[in-house]
């Protein structure tokens, strides 16, 4: 496990973020895609309109918690990358008493605990989470995230 400072470049969805990673001594890795380790968030890019609402709410939670250009701490969880070529890691948030973003996402019902098991095994928990998430009109506006 390694720890780096990084700048938030783009929130792709509730469990994927693009960052610039500071390796130290003026060396940066630019536009690296990070998959949040240990969680699964609803999809924001799907034709399922109901799931999309919750996926956009999850994405908004991440955007509000880690604004663009903010500096965060990234802890990589495994050497290398996951099956889709993304870095696997967690964000430790200095503005939130060093809480981990993945744990905040689960606590606030924007994601479920996930470690590679079948998506069918976590479907019920995603549905239960919907009972706790408030969908704001901003999330439903297609221009909100552009």
List the predicted regions and their residue ranges.
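Small beta-barrel nucleic-acid-binding modules, primarily SNase/OB-fold domains
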Residues: 1-146
């Amino acid at each position: 496990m390694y720890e780096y400072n990084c700048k938030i470049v783009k929130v792709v969805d509730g469990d994927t973020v693009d960052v610039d990673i500071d390796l130290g001594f003026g060396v940066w890795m630019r536009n690296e895609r990070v998959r949040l380790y240990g969680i699964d968030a609803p999809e924001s890019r799907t034709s399922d309109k109901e799931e999309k609402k919750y996926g956009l709410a999850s994405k908004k939670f991440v955007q509000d918690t880690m604004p663009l250009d903010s500096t965060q701490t990234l802890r990589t969880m495994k050497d290398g990358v996951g099956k889709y070529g993304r870095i696997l890691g967690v964000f430790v948030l200095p503005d939130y008493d060093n809480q981990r973003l993945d744990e905040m996402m689960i606590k606030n019902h924007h994601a479920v605990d996930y470690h590679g098991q079948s998506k069918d095994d976590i479907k019920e928990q995603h549905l239960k989470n919907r009972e706790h998430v408030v969908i704001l009109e901003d999330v439903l506006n297609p221009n909100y995230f552009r």
